[in-house]
Amino acid sequence: MVELPFQQSQALNVRQNRALALAGVFQATQLTHMTAMTGQQSIGESGNFYFELLIKASLNIRPTTNNNAVQTLDFFNQLADISLGLKTLENCITQPFTNAPKSRLPKMRSAKLPMSYAMSLLQLEKKVYSNPEYVAIIEKAQQKILKQLSFFDNNYLHPSILANLAQTYVDTAGQINPRILVRGNAEAFKDTNHTNRIRACLFTGLQMAHLWRQLGGSSWNMIFSKRKLLQDIQALARLQYQVI
């Protein structure tokens, strides 16, 4: 049985729980976008904070988890830990319809690339987790990395940890076509540490996509239920900021 990092006193409803997992995917793709465009040293402390939280979650998400008992917040400490993902997700689903949607969350400039990466990850996750060989690779890597952390003072952003996460992505989702093509600073892509960080971001998104699907998420439902999804995001925002 998987030992979950956090246990919540109050559970979200089914839709909110699923929406929060999807926000985790978008948090990963927003960090992928930020890293690719600005470089690994430029995403700031807040970016590293959100990234570390995703890594922790991705190492605990398992394909054998009891879906009925799992809550997205079992893998995070609080709603604020996925606030970047909530902002990104809301921006992505409202931007096509209006230039100035009403929102309780601050808007971001561009949603096109994070949205593209997220949709690709949702498709890749289904293919990865339908292949027992890829699932075994992920589970083996999770166990290896969790053991390694003790040697690196639990530094989830240590280059060796990121390199292992990146390699896990390459060995699984990276073997499936069409591959995700990340746009960014061409010169920075020559740096192995930079590309490892991007691939590690994508791996965390892959894992959050798996959690989302475990919770009943489907691409078709997301496409045709955008209004309900937006309502769920706004409800989560009210819970996060205690808006009355």
Curated annotation (Swiss-Prot):
Entry superkingdom: Bacteria
UniProt keyword terms in alphabetical order: Cell inner membrane, Cell membrane, Cytoplasm, Membrane
SUPFAM superfamilies, per the entry: YcfC-like
InterPro entries given in the database record: HflD, HflD-like_sf
Topology versus the membrane: Peripheral membrane protein
Protein location: Cytoplasm; Cell inner membrane
GO CC annotation: cytoplasm; plasma membrane
Keyword Cell membrane part of the UniProt annotation: yes
Main location (coarse class): cytoplasm
HAMAP family in the record: HflD_protein
Entry similarity comment: Belongs to the HflD family.
Name listed for the protein in its UniProt record: High frequency lysogenization protein HflD homolog
Organism this protein belongs to: Acinetobacter baumannii (strain SDF)
Gene this chain is encoded by: hflD
